[in-house]
Amino acid sequence: MSAVVESHDHHHGPAKGISRWLFTTNHKDIGTLYLWFSFAMFLIGGAMAMVIRAELFQPGMQIVEPEFYNQMLTLHGLIMVFGAVMPAFVGLANWLVPMMVGAPDMALPRMNNLSFWILPFAFGVMLSSLFMEGGAPNFGWTFYAPLSTTYAPPSVT
C-alpha cells in the first residue's frame, strides 16, 4: 500500500508586497525599479533646476548663498546625468534586452538586483553632502576648473 503525501510548498509562490521589489530577480521588476528611480532623480534634479533658475531671475542673491548655489549646480548636473539619464537607459535595457535575445532573464540576476540597490544608497550619500560640513562639490556641472586656477608646471628646458 502506498501513501500519497501532499506537498505544502505554499511559501514558495511568487513574492508579494515589498519583498517582491526588495529581493526580485525578475528583469522586468528590476528594470521598473531603475525607471522609477530615474523618475525620482529627475524630479529632484528638476527641483534643483527651478531653484537655480529662480536665483538667476534677477541679479543679486534671492534664495540661496553663492556657495550653496555652486554646490547645487554641480549636484544638479550629476543627478540629471548619473541619476536620471543613465538609470533610465539601464532600466530600459533590463526590460528589453532579455526579451530581444529570447533569454528568460538577465545573467546573474541577484547581482543585477544588488547593482540597483547600491544606486539609491550612493545618491543618498551624494545628496547628503549638501548638508554636511564642508559642503558638496562646487565646481559646476561640467567639472571644469575655472580658468583662473589653471596651473602650468614649470617647463623643462
Listing of model-derived features with the role each one plays in the protein:
Residues 1-157:
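...captures the hydrophobic TM-helix bundle architecture rather than a specific catalytic motif
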